[in-house]
Amino acid sequence: MATGRTHRPATRSRGIPEATVARLPLYLRALTALSERSVPTVSSEELATAAGVNSAKLRKDFSYLGSYGTRGVGYDVEYLVYQISRELGLTQDWPVAIVGIGNLGAALANYGGFASRGFRVAALIDADPAMAGTPVAGIAVQHTDDLDRIISDNGVSIGVITTPPGAAQQVCDRLVAAGVTSILNFAPTVLSVPEGVDVRKVDLSIELQILAFHEQRKAGEDSAAEDEGAPPMRATPASRKGPDGDMPAVMPA
């Protein structure tokens, strides 16, 4: 039975920083890969490298979980997978509703990685009447007119918005009114929500802009390196000043 509406992970009450919470999925992904290879233990250095963080930060993060590892042995992989999964609330079923079944919404509905991480796509919702009843990833799309009932019937507390930006706030308001308390927003707009509702924004264009910044910086470094390796330019004779100042008396043809 879905319990997503009532359960809350203990991260806030235990005072785990948000930055640490944001890194826990990175550790879990690396640990899951180790578990699938039947690796029993892992050192903080090895796990930090796999997760893309430094080992001191990893050890500090794990101290919030009460996990310090064993000197000379490292961390028990299976126990850490369980511990982090429990902390993130992934040891239970989280029914999710996706609103906006265009290309992105349909792609998310077809993504097979949700179920293995504790998330079940319970409902697909769209404003287009022509979409109603259309199966996507084996789930029939339902109309937004029935949103309140859909959320209630499926015990949904997590909503995913993949609508055009102009419709996102209205959809957000309706989800919140129906009882949704966590929203993943893919629409390129900022949502306003009441206290107690968590929103995570995914903006692919921003991520691309950040990559463009790094590409530009790397290109600048390469250009500077080429300039440093180039032979010095020979000095050219000073131009003869004309009667009107710095311009030569006779301009080149």
From Swiss-Prot:
Belongs to the transcriptional regulatory Rex family. SMART domains: CoA_binding. InterPro entries: CoA-bd, NAD(P)-bd_dom_sf, Rex_DNA-bd_C_dom, Tscrpt_rep_Rex, WH-like_DNA-bd_sf, WH_DNA-bd_sf. NCBIfam families: PRK05472.1-3, PRK05472.2-1, PRK05472.2-2, PRK05472.2-3, PRK05472.2-4, PRK05472.2-5. One of its GO terms (cellular component) is cytoplasm. Homodimer. It is found in: Cytoplasm. Modulates transcription in response to changes in cellular NADH/NAD(+) redox state. GO terms for biological process: negative regulation of DNA-templated transcription; response to redox state. This is Redox-sensing transcriptional repressor Rex.
